[in-house]
């Protein structure tokens, strides 16, 4: 399987308390089916961070990978923007 076919997401790190694991919140805009209002939906992904490089509030890019644990199916690709 080529890596280019894997899903990628960009989000903010909301937790890095675990060893080699970060929690990334990804926001998507969704239109309400009945009323048409555009809402923000937040989904949290647990991602593998081998070098513990990401900190809270960093903007990061994650990529889909094989299952690494019960809940981890994503890995950190790069830190796009460091927190201020």
Curated annotation (Swiss-Prot):
Gene3D superfamilies: Nucleic acid-binding proteins. The keyword Glycosyltransferase does not apply. GO terms for cellular component: cytosolic small ribosomal subunit. The keyword Ribonucleoprotein applies. GO terms for molecular function: rRNA binding; structural constituent of ribosome. SUPFAM superfamilies: Nucleic acid-binding proteins (SSF50249). Pfam families: Ribosomal_S17 (PF00366). Keywords: Ribonucleoprotein, Ribosomal protein, RNA-binding, rRNA-binding. GO terms for biological process: translation. InterPro entries: NA-bd_OB-fold (IPR012340), Ribosomal_uS17 (IPR000266), Ribosomal_uS17_bact/chlr (IPR019984). Belongs to the universal ribosomal protein uS17 family. One of the primary rRNA binding proteins, it binds specifically to the 5'-end of 16S ribosomal RNA. Part of the 30S ribosomal subunit. This is Small ribosomal subunit protein uS17. The gene is rpsQ.
